[in-house]
């Protein structure tokens, strides 16, 4: 299979709209809570790290791992996105990741899966 430039990780893309939200977690939470209020009737999913477990609710929350182990996050990302497909989620909001070393590879895959849909807070 041949990929056009920038499409290498498009196979990561979920069926749902994926939005990466950049900013500290309090801003992330405020943004998502507002969006949930505007998305009546839509199933909302969240991609979070273990550090934020229990800090926000949605129809479906998936944890990719701890920020202390980007290896785990990289390993879990694809499976997490597929689980959202299985649960018919409409919109997914994801935390962003530090773009140093392995974090850059994670963000590269996530950004392409999101179709470059990034909100900077």
Task: For each feature predicted by the language model, list its residue ranges.
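Short, small-residue-biased leader/transition segments that mark boundaries at the very start
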Residues: 1-2
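A C-terminal functional module that forms or caps the active site or interfaces directly
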Residues: 6-115
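Short, flexible loop segments at boundaries between secondary-structure elements
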Residues: 118-121
């Amino acid at each position: 299979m041949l990929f056009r430039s920038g499409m290498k990780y498009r196979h990561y893309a979920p069926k749902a709209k994926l939005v990466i939200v950049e900013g500290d977690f309090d801003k992330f939470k405020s943004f998502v809570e507002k969006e949930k209020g505007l998305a009546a009737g839509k199933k909302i999913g969240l991609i979070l790290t273990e550090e934020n477990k229990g800090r926000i609710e949605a129809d479906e929350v998936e944890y990719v791992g701890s920020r202390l182990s980007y290896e785990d996050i990289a390993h879990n990302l694809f499976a997490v996105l597929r689980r959202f497909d299985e649960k018919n989620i409409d919109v997914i909001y994801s935390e962003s990741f530090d773009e140093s070393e392995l974090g850059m590879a994670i963000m590269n895959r996530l950004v392409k899966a999101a179709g470059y849909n990034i909100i900077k807070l």
